[in-house]
């Protein structure tokens, strides 16, 4: 029996909507990364984009455990401007209370996806919204109840 390898024409993508209200960030990000890659499907093929499309709503209400949410000495995100001495930092608490709180989820998932062209394609299937509204009702997404899978998922 040969090992099954899916062809691009055989891949079926589903649409999922996940409510991130009071959900722990790391647990949510790791599950979403697996769903974007398609590792939850029996037809998973590593070199193809066989993952699903994920819509995350209420991203501003995601929870961080421990001291990571502390605005002063919490989890720090670094970026580099390209100039000498140009390293900038911000905390997860500042991002969540700022203008674009959905970036915390996008960064967490992006760092769990492979860093190549396939990973960029898979990240384009992730849609994160700060509030409860999303413009993807025409795709008829299925509600994915992440909070009830494990009591540790909710805080």
From Swiss-Prot:
InterPro entries: Ribosomal_uL13 (IPR005822), Ribosomal_uL13_bac-type (IPR005823), Ribosomal_uL13_CS (IPR023563), Ribosomal_uL13_sf (IPR036899). Keywords: Ribonucleoprotein, Ribosomal protein. PROSITE patterns: RIBOSOMAL_L13 (PS00783). Disulfide bonds: none annotated. GO terms for biological process: negative regulation of translation; translation. GO terms for molecular function: mRNA binding; structural constituent of ribosome. SUPFAM superfamilies: Ribosomal protein L13. GO terms for cellular component: cytosolic large ribosomal subunit. Pfam families: Ribosomal_L13. HAMAP family: Ribosomal_uL13 (MF_01366). Part of the 50S ribosomal subunit. This protein is one of the early assembly proteins of the 50S ribosomal subunit, although it is not seen to bind rRNA by itself. It is important during the early stages of 50S assembly. Belongs to the universal ribosomal protein uL13 family. This is Large ribosomal subunit protein uL13. It comes from Rickettsia peacockii (strain Rustic). The lineage of its organism: Bacteria, Pseudomonadati, Pseudomonadota, Alphaproteobacteria, Rickettsiales.
